[in-house]
Structure formats: structure tokens, C-alpha cells
């Protein structure tokens, strides 16, 4: 959701990534301080998904769900041909904790099919390896002709989930907004 929004920003909007805000001074002109610089802007949307919610703004309304997934190496042309004619695709489960399977633009298959409560933390290496066995079994069941394809990447992330399973967009002050609990499902 946020990536889609970022791609369509008008020329007069600046996007700052990988720049954690460590202090905010609200006002007619908001001042945001990062470890490297200070940013001043009249209007600010903080798209922070989960982390700030856990410790402040909405902690009574949100829980952190830890997800994990695996991504294959780049597929060969012969392997891609076993998948049909679509050049990139994604499948989302109707169930909120269900699997996500994608053929990426760079011709890898990404599978994410574990969602669990892990006390708002990422999975450790041992937990990740155990989850990768689940990913492998699911991958082999869905793509038996590709069961020889190894996973090259393994990841986990914490996603904010609200009780009513929707996102949060909140006005914190007249010109400061917060966006959280967005995961892109159903979009």
C-alpha cells in the first residue's frame, strides 16, 4: 500500500526512507529530527505500519503478528515455462492469516504462509529455519515440478493487526497524520 502511494506522489512531495524520526515538534510547520538531519514540513504523513503503535498511539487497539516467508533463487526459463504464460503474479488467501504466493518481476517465487504471535518480535534463526520447513512443504505441494529449486532468502517481519482487521489512519494534529496496520491484503 505505501509503496504504491510512494510511486504516485506529486512533484511537490518529498519521500524520506530509512530515516527514523527520533523527535517530532508539532506546529504550523512540523519539525522532524532524524539521526542525520532535520526536516521541516507543513503537512506530514508518518507511514510507520506497526512499531509506533506498540509503544504509544494505539497500543490498546493493535497486536503484532510475526510473519515469515521464503524466496527462491531466480528461476530458469525452462522452470518459468512450467508456471504458464503470466510473467508476474500474486495470490492472496481470503483468510487473513493465509498464504501469499508470488512470482516476482525478477522471476523468483516468494511464499509466505506462517503468521503467529511472537511477543511483537522477529523470529530468531532457529525459529526461521523451522518455518522454512513449512514453506518448503507448501512450495513442493504447489509446484511439484519445481521441488528441486532451492530457497535463497528467508525473512520474518512484524505486522500490526487491529481487532477489526483494518488499517489506522489518524489525524494527530491539524497537519500531522499517522498511517499504520497496512499490509496490502485485499488491495
Which ranges hold each PLM region?
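Conserved mid-domain beta->alpha element of the FAD-binding
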Residues: 170, 174-187
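Helical element adjacent to the flavin cofactor pocket in flavoenzyme catalytic cores
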Residues: 1-42
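Hydrophobic/aromatic beta-strand patches that form the interior of the parallel beta-sheet core
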Residues: 16, 45, 177-179
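Active-site substrate-recognition segment that forms the wall
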Residues: 21-23, 30, 38-77, 82-174
Amino acid at each position: 500500500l505505501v509503496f504504491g502511494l510512494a510511486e504516485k506522489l506529486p512533484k511537490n512531495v518529498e519521500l524520506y526512507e530509512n530515516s527514523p524520526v527520533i523527535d517530532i515538534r508539532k506546529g504550523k510547520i512540523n519539525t522532524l529530527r532524524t539521526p542525520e538531519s532535520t526536516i521541516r514540513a507543513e503537512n506530514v504523513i508518518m507511514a510507520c505500519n506497526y512499531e509506533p503503535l506498540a509503544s504509544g498511539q494505539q497500543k490498546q487497539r493493535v497486536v503484532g503478528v510475526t510473519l515469515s516467508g521464503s524466496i527462491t533463487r531466480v528461476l530458469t526459463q525452462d522452470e518459468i515455462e512450467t508456471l504458464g504464460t503470466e510473467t508476474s503474479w500474486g495470490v492472496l488467501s481470503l483468510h487473513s492469516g493465509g498464504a501469499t504466493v508470488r512470482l516476482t518481476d525478477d522471476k523468483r517465487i516468494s511464499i509466505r504462509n506462517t503468521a503467529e504471535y511472537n511477543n511483537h518480535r522477529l523470529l530468531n534463526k532457529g525459529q526461521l529455519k523451522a518455518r522454512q520447513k513449512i514453506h518448503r512443504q507448501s512450495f513442493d505441494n504447489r509446484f511439484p515440478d519445481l521441488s528441486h529449486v532451492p530457497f535463497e532468502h528467508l525473512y520474518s517481519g512484524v505486522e500490526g493487526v487491529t481487532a477489526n482487521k483494518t488499517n489506522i489512519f489518524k489525524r494527530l494534529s491539524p497537519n500531522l497524520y499517522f498511517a499504520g496496520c497496512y499490509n496490502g491484503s485485499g488491495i
